[in-house]
Regions:
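ATP-binding N-lobe of GHMP and related small-molecule kinases
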Residues: 1-88, 96-108, 138-140
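Alpha/beta catalytic cores of group-transfer enzymes, especially the acyltransferase/condensing modules
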Residues: 106-143
């Protein structure tokens, strides 16, 4: 397993958020001014990880064989509590970094679904798919 890093952008929802939770329509796009960057490193400990990254690691290891121990660390300049999807960007960047290190290629849909699983089932965040679809596809989205 090699060391790796990956990024994900925040997003803006122009129309429909949070109606996507209930199957409603939405319109949004990623913001390229900021990003969450996650580093996977085999030389650091896992004990210092924030709960968001611990939950992400757990979801990844449920579906993929983890070859050796590694730690995750992050840098993010996404404004906190601004409604830009910062937590999903951090989860998505971590999943991308783990996939890259383990030779796994995500489809945009599986990446978005795994991110939503981390947030809903492991962290109790109430969310719909729109944020994650925008961030996984990295483009303007009407859904």
């Amino acid at each position: 397993m090699k060391q790796s890093f990956a990024t994900a952008q925040p997003r803006v929802s122009l129309i429909g958020n949070p109606s996507d939770i209930y199957g409603g329509f939405g319109l949004g796009f990623p913001i390229w001014n900021w990003q969450a960057k996650v580093f996977l490193d085999t030389s650091i400990s896992t004990t210092e990880e924030i709960p968001l990254l611990q939950a992400t690691r757990e979801v990844f290891s449920q579906h993929h064989t983890v070859k050796q121990k590694f730690g995750l660390r992050f840098i993010s300049d996404i404004p906190l509590q601004a409604g830009l999807g910062g937590s999903s960007a951090l989860v998505m960047a971590a999943l991308r970094a783990m996939g890259k290190a383990h030779g796994f290629q995500w489809t945009w849909r599986s990446l978005a679904d795994a991110t939503l699983t981390v947030e809903q089932e492991h962290l109790g965040i109430i969310a719909g798919p729109m944020d994650r679809w925008i961030q996984a596809q990295e483009e303007f989205l009407w859904m």
